[in-house]
């Protein structure tokens, strides 16, 4: 009888611990999603997730969300070394999440986003060796979830970044971004990336249309991204192509 009581207690404590962890992760992501209201929310989000990972190293969600947070921390620092430090941390937590569950689209996505940022920070020519891995990761994500708009965007921008001789193709970029916008028309980054693609083609009329759409989004999928990143970038690009 005592054996069964012990087993029941273990199960109960496990459930309570899992519920507590879920609540902490929810709180961390609430802070992450409202970082446009308070800049300190991002580091607070990191600290909470770090605590969960330290107490539960195999918590899938905590690891891939921490990977996501480090990606944003990397975007927010100034120097190349600081950026690489943040992105590499994000990569490692994404890698851990993949090991926990190789069929997690989120684990693969935040891993590959950090890998991509490492490549962008080092420069395309210094990061060509990363391209096969990025392609493999994106294809894995889209196999798990064919409508993963983030993965479609990464794949699209890979075609945008690569030189033509190495497979770059801005028309393919536009095709993939169009597909992503059909799936989620409130994902503001897609419009900025689409505009950048048209600017590359010197099609400024279409570029302006997509840049103006950014300000028209009423219910953004990622409000903090719209306010902190996408809208300012759209306005900056509109100024750059003014009169063209």
Give a label for each model feature.
Residues 16-70:
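N-terminal leader/linker segments that initiate helical-solenoid repeat arrays
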Residues 24, 200, 206-244:
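Terminal, low-structured helical/coil segments at or just beyond the last alpha-helical repeat
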Residues 34-50, 83-93, 127-133, 166-174:
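Helix-turn-helix repeat elements of alpha-solenoid scaffolds
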């Amino acid at each position: 009888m005592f054996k069964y009581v012990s087993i029941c207690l273990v199960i109960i404590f496990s459930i309570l611990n899992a519920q507590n962890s879920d609540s902490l992760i929810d709180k961390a992501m609430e802070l992450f999603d409202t970082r446009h209201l308070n800049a300190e929310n991002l580091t607070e989000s990191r600290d909470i997730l770090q605590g969960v990972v330290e107490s539960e190293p195999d918590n899938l969600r905590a690891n891939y969300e921490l990977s996501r947070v480090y990606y944003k921390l990397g975007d927010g620092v100034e120097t190349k070394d600081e950026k690489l430090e943040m992105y590499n941390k994000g990569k490692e937590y994404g890698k851990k999440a993949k090991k926990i569950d190789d069929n997690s689209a989120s684990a693969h996505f935040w891993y590959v986003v950090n890998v991509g940022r490492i490549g962008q920070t080092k420069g395309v020519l210094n990061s060509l060796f990363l391209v096969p891995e990025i392609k493999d990761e994106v294809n894995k994500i889209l196999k798990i979830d064919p409508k993963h708009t983030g993965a479609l965007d990464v794949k699209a921008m890979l075609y945008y970044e690569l030189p033509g001789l190495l497979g770059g193709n801005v028309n393919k970029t536009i095709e993939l971004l169009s597909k992503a916008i059909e799936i989620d028309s409130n994902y503001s980054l897609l419009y900025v990336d689409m505009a950048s693609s048209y600017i590359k083609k010197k099609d400024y009329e279409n570029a302006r249309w997509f840049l103006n759409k950014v300000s028209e989004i009423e219910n953004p999928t990622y409000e903090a991204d719209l306010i902190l990143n996408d809208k300012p970038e759209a306005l900056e690009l509109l100024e750059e192509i003014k009169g063209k």
